[in-house]
């Protein structure tokens, strides 16, 4: 087993492993753990009481964080004619159709989010095996398959976070930067959790959020009060 670095061990001294933190305490504490030479991402990790191998227990969606993510997002749009013009006017970084699909097939993926109009999803399907594993395949559930291109581009640029439960029932997401104010991080966190709660499957029995933790890119994690998370509606 790899040993923790001296820096990480120093951070561990600031964290009480036996403590369950409320949101305010967790955000206050996690901001004291910044030690990297870059603006670390504040990360939320959740363990949900779902079994995603069943389609009716898949938790997937998107949410626009009020303070954004602190990350510059490059947006590509697959559209034609008037919708292509709409994408350009909305501020999309890359706009195209067949030629953009060809670039993706070559491995030239110079974007973070891909949006497509519904009528071109047959075209997008040609590169599904490339986009799927990278988590950037357009999907109606994340509002990336839409005719409302202007709003989709705006949301992607302003801090939309897509989430999807993995095979073990976990959801991990970046909800801002450690340089954000405490209030900004708290608002982003509560907005994210509220959206997760809205997506609770009707077939999920028992305690929906089994555990939660807050951390930075390079820090130990803090255990969150799951009851407080569940109460966010």
Swiss-Prot record:
The keyword rRNA-binding applies. Pfam families: Ribosomal_L1. One of its GO terms (molecular function) is tRNA binding. InterPro entries: Ribosom_uL1_bac-type, Ribosomal_uL1, Ribosomal_uL1-like, Ribosomal_uL1/biogenesis, Ribosomal_uL1_3-a/b-sand, Ribosomal_uL1_CS. One of its GO terms (biological process) is regulation of translation. Signal peptide: none annotated. The keyword rRNA-binding applies. GO terms for cellular component: cytosolic large ribosomal subunit. Keywords: Repressor, Ribonucleoprotein, Ribosomal protein, RNA-binding, rRNA-binding, Translation regulation, tRNA-binding. Binds directly to 23S rRNA. The L1 stalk is quite mobile in the ribosome, and is involved in E site tRNA release. Part of the 50S ribosomal subunit. Belongs to the universal ribosomal protein uL1 family. This is Large ribosomal subunit protein uL1.
């Amino acid at each position: 087993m790899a040993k923790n670095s001296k820096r990480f061990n120093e951070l561990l001294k600031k964290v009480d492993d036996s403590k369950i933190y409320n949101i305010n305490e967790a955000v206050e504490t996690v901001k004291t753990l910044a030690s990297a030479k870059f603006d670390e991402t504040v990360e939320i990790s959740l363990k949900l009481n779902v079994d995603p191998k069943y389609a009716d227990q898949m938790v997937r969606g998107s949410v626009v964080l009020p303070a954004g993510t602190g990350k510059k997002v490059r947006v590509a749009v697959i559209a034609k004619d008037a919708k292509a013009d709409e994408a350009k006017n909305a501020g999309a970084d890359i706009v195209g159709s067949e030629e953009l699909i060809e670039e993706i097939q070559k491995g030239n993926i110079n974007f973070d989010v891909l949006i497509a109009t519904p009528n071109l999803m047959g075209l997008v399907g040609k590169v599904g095996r490339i986009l799927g594993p990278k988590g950037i395949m357009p999907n109606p559930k994340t509002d990336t398959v839409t005719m409302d291109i202007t709003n989709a581009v705006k949301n992607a640029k302003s801090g939309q976070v897509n989430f999807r439960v993995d095979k073990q029932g976990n959801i991990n997401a970046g909800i801002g930067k450690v340089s954000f104010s405490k209030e900004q991080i708290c608002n982003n966190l509560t907005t994210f959790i509220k959206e997760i709660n809205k997506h609770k499957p009707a077939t999920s029995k028992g305690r929906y959020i089994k555990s939660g933790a807050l951390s930075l890119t390079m820090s130990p994690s803090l255990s969150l009060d799951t009851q407080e998370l569940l109460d966010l509606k």
